[in-house]
Structure formats: C-alpha cells, structure tokens
C-alpha cells in the first residue's frame, strides 16, 4: 500500500466512523509502527518463500492514547492492547493460511496464536479479528459457533472450531 492508498483508507475509515481497522495483504516490507497524522499504523511483514503475507492495524488518534502496547508477532498476526474501563481490550489481527498450506505451517500459526492468547490477561476483553480463510458451515458447536454459518465446513474451518473449543 503506497502513501496515496493509505490516505484513501484513512479517509474511508473516518467516513464510516471506525477507530480500528485491520488490513491483510498489505504489501509493505519490514515491521514497525508509525504516526500518519490522524492515525497510527502498526504493521508486520516477513517475506515467505511463497508470497508476502502482511498484517496491519490502523488506529485512529482518538484511541491511540489508550494503547498500552503492541506485539508484532509475525507476518500473519499482531496484537494491540488498549486501556479500557473496567477492563483492558486486546485486539489480535490474524491472516490465516489457506487450505493448501503445509500442516506444519498451520500448526505453527495456531501455536503463535496460542502464545498471544497466553500473554492476554484473563480479565481483558479479547477480540481476534482477521481473515481466517475458513468455512465453518452451518452446524452448531455449543459455546463456539451458532447454526447460522454459510456453506460447507472445510478443513480450515474444522481446525478453527477445534482451536476455539480448546481455548474457550
């Protein structure tokens, strides 16, 4: 995303009155954070053998002062913790692997996500947002999914449900 596109994204974020925006497939290199006038950008990219898989969170300046910290975990997930009352809020942005990824890569993804969850205090409110590249289907899994999903469940969807059930 070039500077011009970043400005368009920031304008659209303001138009729809959102304070936090997640982005997948950003196409920037490196990792870090920077101030962009009325927004703060956290991003992480590591070039893989297959392609670049970047994630970012763009935070409006209205809530930037509430940021307690950021973890740039890897090119597929980052987290930002916001001070809240009565609880802090942890936002984890993910970009999951596609169904043709190696099983070891998928295991690594969920292990890294588990690491981030373990760093999140139990009392914090947790939001895991992003692109899961999964279809969970319409079958209800009590405590995890409702019966209003779409399509047929795929392997990535089953793996996501299992992860949610274990960590619920």
Give the positions of each predicted feature.
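A shared catalytic/ligand-binding motif for oxyanion handling
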Residues: 1-168
């Amino acid at each position: 995303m070039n500077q011009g596109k970043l400005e368009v994204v920031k304008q659209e974020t303001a138009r729809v009155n959102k304070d936090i925006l997640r982005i997948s497939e950003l196409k920037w290199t490196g990792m870090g954070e920077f101030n962009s006038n009325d927004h703060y950008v956290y991003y992480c990219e590591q070039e893989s053998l297959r392609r670049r898989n970047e994630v970012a969170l763009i935070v409006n300046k209205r809530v930037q002062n509430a940021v307690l910290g950021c973890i740039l975990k890897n090119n597929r997930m980052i987290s930002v913790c916001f001070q809240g009352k009565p609880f802090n809020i942890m936002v984890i942005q993910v970009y999951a692997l596609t169904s043709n990824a190696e099983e070891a890569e998928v295991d690594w993804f969920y292990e890294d996500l588990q690491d981030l969850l373990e760093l999140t205090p139990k009392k914090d409110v947790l939001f895991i947002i992003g692109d899961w590249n999964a279809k969970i289907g319409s079958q209800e899994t009590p405590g995890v999914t409702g019966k209003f999903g779409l399509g047929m469940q795929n392997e990535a969807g089953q793996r996501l449900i299992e992860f949610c059930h274990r960590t619920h």
